[in-house]
Design a protein with these regions (language model features):
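GHKL/Bergerat-fold ATPase module
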Residues: 157, 164-169
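GHKL-type ATPase core
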Residues: 1-7, 18-144
């Protein structure tokens, strides 16, 4: 905890405080180097954070980028992961219409880059949910963009490096 704040609150309210907490992790990250979620929060009228971790569900709500109350343990869960729901602020955005296809394309790319995790997009207006999960990561991405094209090689050449500190093995 920093300044009597949970790590989640620090990440939500401080630039460059992303979930990696060190520069080395960003060598293999598909994120925005610790500014993404704090900027979303800063530009939102309301934001809800739900964290599923170690068998517990934690909740914190924000209004105009400020926490309404501290992070609270809110029951048990068998899930893992984080859910962010937000409403952009009309102070910063004139048009609050989302380009769903653009958002879905970016989430799909993130799912390829972060193989083995599920990323979900829910359209609250239509109720339609889209999930992205790719165990094969970049291999699946290459196979998808090749679609019906002729491969140069029968099998895709792929190296999955192990990164430890500043060293790649």
């Amino acid at each position: 905890k920093a300044e009597n704040k949970s790590a989640a609150e620090v990440i939500m309210t401080t630039l460059h405080a992303g979930g990696k907490f060190d520069d080395d992790s960003y060598k293999v990250s598909g994120g925005l180097h610790g500014v993404g979620v704090s900027v979303v929060n800063a530009l939102s009228e309301r934001l809800s954070l739900t964290v599923h971790k170690d068998g517990f569900k934690y909740q914190q709500d924000y209004k105009d980028s400020h926490p309404i109350k501290p992070l609270e343990k809110n029951g048990n869960t068998d899930q893992t992961g984080t859910v962010i729901q937000f409403l952009p602020s009309t102070k910063y955005f004139k048009d609050l219409n989302y380009k769903e296809d653009v958002i879905k394309k970016r989430l799909k790319e993130l799912a390829f880059l972060n193989s083995g995790i599920t990323i979900k997009f829910t359209n609250d207006v239509s109720g339609k949910e889209t999930s992205y999960y790719y165990e094969g990561g970049l291999r699946e991405y290459i196979n998808e963009i090749l679609n019906n094209k002729k491969d140069i090689h029968d099998n895709l050449i792929y190296i999955d490096p192990i990164v430890k500190g500043n060293n790649t093995i």
